[in-house]
Regions:
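FAD-binding core/adjacent interface of flavoenzyme oxidoreductases
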Residues: 1-71, 91, 162, 173
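A Rossmann-like FAD-binding core segment of flavoenzymes
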Residues: 89-188
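Glycine-rich Rossmann-fold phosphate-binding loop(s) that bind the pyrophosphate
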Residues: 75-78
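N-terminal Rossmann-fold NAD(P) dinucleotide-binding loop
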Residues: 81-82
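Short glycine-rich anion-binding loops that position phosphate/pyrophosphate groups of nucleotides
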Residues: 19-22, 85, 178-179
Length: 188
């Protein structure tokens, strides 16, 4: 109540919307290198991180270092991951090209990793195929059946049917896996 005393309320149904957090599937150390996106603050951090990488690439003299700054890896090809790589591609190809002098933002390498056999795993197969075609058409590298097995501040290694591959790049964003929030776990 207004004087900070508890108030008893009656109800027929109580809905507790405690939210969710990221699940790194037992690889919690990945959180340091691939932040997730579940809150508005996460989204703002991700936006700022992406834009700052273009700035860092602009300042880099070494072509290999520049390529690392312009490499963006998104882990998880559900709706969040698919939308995110699409937005990064739009930024790189449409929004940012006139803003930089020493880099071509269209050279950005955008990679989408998914552990399942297709993008948008729970959706209809026609939508999955269409989405993959669209993403590849805008320059996104799509790797399905691919699991992140190691990462640090400069690279990610993943295992796929083709074997282990390492991608050097400074930006990794976690869009895979959802876990109950700490409050929801307590209530369960």
């Amino acid at each position: 109540g207004p004087d900070d005393r508890p108030v008893d309320l009656s109800y027929d149904t109580l809905i507790v919307a405690a939210g969710a957090t990221h699940s790194y599937f037992g690889k919690n150390e990945f959180a340091e290198f691939a932040p997730g996106m579940k809150t508005i603050e996460d989204a703002r951090f991700t936006r700022d991180a992406i834009l700052s990488k273009f700035e860092m690439a602009e300042e880099a003299a070494d072509p290999a270092e520049r390529a690392e700054w312009l490499t963006f890896v998104v882990i998880g090809a559900g709706p969040t991951g698919v939308e995110l790589v699409g937005q990064i591609a739009e930024l790189a190809h449409t929004v940012l090209p006139r803003d930089y002098r020493s880099i071509n933002t269209k050279d950005a390498r955008i990679v989408l990793l998914e552990g399942a056999p297709s993008v948008l795993p729970p959706f209809d197969k026609k939508l999955q195929a269409y989405t993959r075609r669209v993403l590849e058409g805008i320059g996104v590298e799509v790797h399905t059946n691919s699991l992140a097995i190691a990462m640090d501040h400069e690279s990610i290694t993943f295992k796929s049917p083709e074997g282990e591959q390492t991608i050097r790049g400074r930006t990794r964003i976690w869009a895979a896996g959802v876990a109950a929030s700490p409050l929801a776990k307590q209530l369960a």
